Structure formats: C-alpha cells, structure tokens
From Swiss-Prot:
Cofactors required: Mg(2+)
Keyword NADP: no
Binding site for ATP: 116, 162
Species of origin: Methanosarcina acetivorans (strain ATCC 35395 / DSM 2834 / JCM 12185 / C2A)
Protein name: Hydroxyethylthiazole kinase
Alphabetical UniProt keywords: ATP-binding, Kinase, Magnesium, Metal-binding, Nucleotide-binding, Thiamine biosynthesis, Transferase
C-alpha cells in the first residue's frame, strides 16, 4: 500500500483492544495519534459485540486473568466469523506456566492473523529454547528469522518478532525492519504500542505481512525523529506522540529502512 497513513486518517478504523492495564492508556493514545479510533472493551458481556463493529482486534496478555482470556476468546471468535484481523501480543510468554498455557489455549481455539512478541516470546511459542525475564527477552538459541518463518508457516499467520531489528514473516516472505531508536526501549509500553499500530495498519491493508512491515517502519521512524529532539525517556515520550501525530507517508518514504530476506 502506497499511502497507508493517509488511508488510516481518512477512514479512521475502530481498533478494539483487550489489553493489559499497565499500558492501556498508552495504546489508546498511540492509536489516536496515528488517526485511528481506540476502544477498550473487556467485559465478556459486551466484548464480542464491540469486535463486530471494529476493523481490527488487538489482544495483549500482559495482565492476564481467567475472565480476560474468556473475553479474548469470545472476541476473537467474533472476529474470525467476520474476517476481522486479529493481533495477539504474547507478552511474557515463557515467564509462567499459566501464561504459557493461556497463550497456547488462544492459539488452539481461534485463528490469529498476526502473532507479535519479542524474540524470546515467539521462540517459546514456537517450541524453541528461550529465556524470558518477566516480560523482557533475554536469550534465544535458534536463528530468529528462521524461527519466525517456520512458526508463521505452522500457524498460517504473520509473525512479528520485535527487538533491535524487527522480523516479520508470513512463512514465504521475511522482512527485517531496522527503523527505530534505543530510547524506544527506555519507556514502558512501546512494545504494546507496536501491537496496536500493527492492528491499525492491518485494518486498512489485507496483506498482513506488508501491513506489519509498514507499521514497524512508521513507528520506528517516529522513534528516530523523536530521539533527535529528546534528552531522555521523559522528553522522548512526549516527542514520540508529537512525531506520530505530525507524521506523513511522504516523510516516512525517505526514512524506511528494511530488507527482504
């Protein structure tokens, strides 16, 4: 898609989040800064109905409860019925048995179009040896790009692995996105924001691999622009929102930094 940001801002897709309580505010604000409309409906009594009127569903397991999992399954089933893209951010997989079991339950029960996580989280989901410290990646034995490609084929989905370089694969195509800045890792929530951004780009582009690649290029470019004006995490966070708000397709076109493997 040549002008995804213009399309997002013209159509203002509604992005339904069932997400974690730590970064819910940040995800809502970032979705809005890009030009889409966020909604955070978690109750099992209404979540499926909200999904039905949305353009994408973003699930984030950062602060899990049994009720939240029930809501995620209800909403994902509703999204599957209507061919609405579903993004799963596998936050903290590998840290606890409950988290691992619930992530596996989601994947076994509904179709996820885009699975996102850091290197350790995706490796753990894919059955590889990996270490996770809380919700942070520590180490992975296998080649990340190969893990992403194989897992994408196995799940018939797009896999997004975030890190110093972001890896996106649909099992056939694999992209390495190099946009971004180290300050993005200094504030809580940028990984969760990335999942929201992937969701809103998927809402306007049915090629989910291309959508995820663009989402991370645009977000990473915003981080680079914000870092140039910042003296630390506090000022960076403010500038990040401003740079996203003032972003344009034309500006990102010259900044995109990715390669296809």
């Amino acid at each position: 898609m040549n002008e995804p940001l213009k399309t997002i801002r013209e159509t203002k897709p509604l992005i339904h989040h069932i997400t974690n309580w730590v970064t819910i505010y940040e995800c809502a604000n970032m979705t809005r800064a890009f030009g889409a409309l966020p909604v955070m409906a978690h109750a099992p009594e209404e979540c499926a109905d909200m999904t039905k009127i949305s353009s994408a569903l973003v699930l984030n397991i950062g602060t899990l409860t049994s009720e939240i999992i029930d809501s995620m399954l209800l909403s994902a089933a509703a999204a599957n019925e209507r061919d609405i893209p579903v993004v799963l951010d596998a936050v903290g997989v590998g840290a606890t048995k409950f988290r691992d079991e619930m992530a596996a339950k989601i994947l076994a029960s509904v179709h996820i179009d885009i699975i996102k996580g850091n290197y350790s989280e995706i490796a753990k989901l894919a059955g590889e040896n990996a270490e996770t410290k809380g919700v942070e990646a520590t180490s992975i034995d296998a080649d990340p790009a190969k893990v992403a490609k194989a897992f994408a084929k196995a799940e018939s989905c797009v896999v997004v692995m975030t890190g110093k370089e972001d890896i996106i694969s649909d099992g056939d195509r694999t992209f390495i996105v190099k946009n971004g800045h180290e300050l993005m890792g200094s504030i809580v929530g940028t990984g969760c924001m990335a999942a929201s951004i992937v969701g809103l780009f998927a809402a306007v582009n049915r090629d989910y691999c291309d959508a995820a690649k663009d989402a991370l290029c645009y977000f990473g470019a915003s981080g680079e622009l914000a870092a140039a004006k910042s003296s630390g995490p506090g000022s960076f966070k403010v500038h990040l929102y401003d740079e996203v708000f003032n972003l344009s397709d034309e500006k990102v076109k010259s900044m995109k930094n990715f390669e296809e493997k």
